[in-house]
């Protein structure tokens, strides 16, 4: 695979959609439950949910351009024995009043607005990053991908860990700033600065859609 010191190649890119599951971004999901029951936690659901139309637009643009769309989802066993995160820190997980991203439950499903199409990969992870202990790298290499465009939630945790993992696997990374979000806007902005400084080209949805259209036109 080519060196990440070179710039991103949108013509050899894949869209990675991270954790757009009901428990993270649906108004009846686990994060929304925290926002209602523990407002002091500062979970900004409107900010998280504002990613949905941007992610949908990007997924449609990648499909139109003939580029792959790959879903990454965080799912755990009902007893949380395979979980790699202390969910009790945010009032979820073992002993909580409701399951959180448990495999086979509604909360762990990709939201209806962003359901994968036939033939699109769904990569299940147990921790934060999409590359750690998953087949993601093999899937991307098989498709000839050199650049990953990353969207989803949350900016400071699973999104940023996936970006860092991509760099470590020698991919060129693009982070779409209006298609990612954190539970807190201030920490979101801080993480975007870190990403732009060290790990990824930070773009808007409009910019990435234009890049895809330009690459498609160049092939024709």
Can you name each region flagged by the protein language model?
Residues 22, 47, 73-76:
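Short glycine-rich, polar/acidic loop-and-turn segments at beta strand-coil junctions
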Residues 70-72, 204:
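A structural signal for short, well-ordered beta-strand segments and their strand-loop junctions
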